[in-house]
Each structure stands twice: as C-alpha cells, then as structure tokens.
Amino acid sequence: MEQIYDMIVIGGGPAGYTAALYAARAGLSTLVLEKLSAGGQMALTEQIDNYPGFEDGIDGFTLGEKMQQSAERFGAVTELAEVYKVSLSGRIKTLDTSEGVFQSRTVVIATGASPRPLGVPGEEALVGKRVHYCAACDGAPYRGKTVAVVGGGNSAAADALTLSRIAKKVYLIHRRDSLRATKVYHEPLMNAPNVEFCWNSTVSALLHESRLTGLRLKDVNTGAERDLACDGVFISVGRAPATELFQVELALDKSGYIIADESTRTSIPGVFAVGDVRTKALRQVVTAVSDGAVAVHYAEEYLAENR
C-alpha cells in the first residue's frame, strides 16, 4: 500500500521548508516536492541582509540549504520532482509528479511567484550579476553607487524610494510619462534629490562584460536610443505567481495569487498557501518563514479533527 503522508509541501523555498520543519518536528510524516533545488527564488539572491541571525548576511543558496537540512534533521523527506497535476478536494489529496503519484492528508502550497522579466537578450545570464528583482533583498551592496529601477507601479516606486536612501543616484525608467503607482509615492520620489526620471523609455539592451555596466534606453515616441551607465538594475515590472496547477480547484485573486488570509487556509479544507504564492502585503523571506509555521499550526488542528 502506498504511503499516505500527513503533509506534502509543494515547493522548497523558505516558506515550504519552514512548514516542513515544523511539521516533521511535530511528528507528522512530511514530504517536500521541489523541482530544482532548495531555496526557490531566494537561492538567486547573492546577499540577504534582512534575515535575523546572520550579522554579515548570507547568500540565498546557502540559507536555502540550511533550511532544508533543518527540516530533514527532524525527518522531513525531499523528493526532487515536478508536480504535473493535483486533486485537492477530497479528504486524501493526490499529486501526480515526474517521480510518481503521492498522497497526503494535507497539502501546503509554497510554489512562490517569479518576477516578470524584461525579456531582453542576456537578462537570464546576468541575474545576480548586478541584475536584480528586489531592492529590499539586494539593495544593500549599492550604497553610494548608481542604480536604475525599471517599472512604474507600486513595487517599482517602493524600490526606487528604498534605493534612494542608500544609493548615490537612482534612475527610474518608465515607458509612460507618469507613474502608475499610487499617489502616496509621487511626492517623496519627486522630492528626492538623487532620483532622476527617464520617462517614455524602455530598456532595449543590457550592457555588460562579465557583469552589468549599463542599459540601452529607447524612447517610445521617437525610437532614439541612448546608453545609461549604472552599477546595477532592479527590474520591477510585475510578478507571476506559480498557480497554474491550482486554477480549477482553488480560489485565486485577479492577479492569480491564491486567496488565503493570515491563517494561510485556502478555499479547500486541508490545503494551505504560504509565502509569495498567496495574497499578502509583504513578500519577504522573513514573512514566508512565518507563513510556514502558521500553516502547520492550522494543519495540526485540521488533522486532529479529520483523522
């Protein structure tokens, strides 16, 4: 007879491995399904300075490995597998994967959300080499340097404000002639002496040798191009939650995030959503870790009532 786990966690990022740690430590049989390696998007971050306990910071890959090891120390098992199909509505949840079919009484979805890329040549190869997607995560090394932020929404505006406090110069590049961000961001950005707006502009190329050295900007009205030197770029043109598997069964918001409140409970009993994949105000490593712990608290309640 195939094993039925108490909990299967889909995704091995900080939220997923925290859930696995808490579940395994509580004596629940726990399986983590991860298609790549520990850490998720966090593993791409060169330096994390805002996660407590590391006075000199830590890179995302190493932190992800440490989280995996902590969970496995208490008995959680990791299976490198991609999930192709899920059936979550029944009392026993079934997951079809590249490594076979797995069943569980509860499921924690920790599939995360990926930054939307600009789609210019060389972008993927430069990620982590002065090309970033999160100012709060990766901004600290740019103190006193020149950076660019691409985007015009709330995330881009927040990133530009964050960077303006540490960088010598911040270029905010937007394809329109005004910000889409809410008005609360406009005045602080306009008044920041080190923020310069590049209106009606898109990035047509990333200038680089082994690392980024600048951007090529294209005027959307005239087509004219110019080069802009910078030490780093922060791309903030939206995020895409990894929720394709769950569109049929789970309630999602208009942006595709799984609807779950601070309890992490979803629209299906026994199914929880944690980290960047769920509706929430702040998507950071530390809030993802919190979600993982909370999910196990409510999963234990659910299991006690549904054994």
PLM region spans:
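A Rossmann-like FAD-binding core segment of flavoenzymes
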Residues: A71-D96, V101-F102, S164-E262, E301-R307
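Beta1-alpha1 glycine-rich phosphate/pyrophosphate-binding loop at the start
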Residues: Y5-F74, A157-K183, D253
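Glycine-rich, N-terminal phosphate-binding loop of Rossmann-like dinucleotide-binding domains
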Residues: G12, T111-G112, V237-G238
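Phosphate-coordination loops involved in phosphoryl transfer and adenosine-cofactor binding
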Residues: I4-D6, L80, R143-K145, N200, ...
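FAD-site-proximal beta/loop scaffold in flavoenzymes
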Residues: G119, E124-P141, V237-T287, D291, ...
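Glycine/small-residue-rich loop that forms an oxyanion/phosphate-binding "nest" at active or ligand-binding sites
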Residues: T78-R143, V147, G152
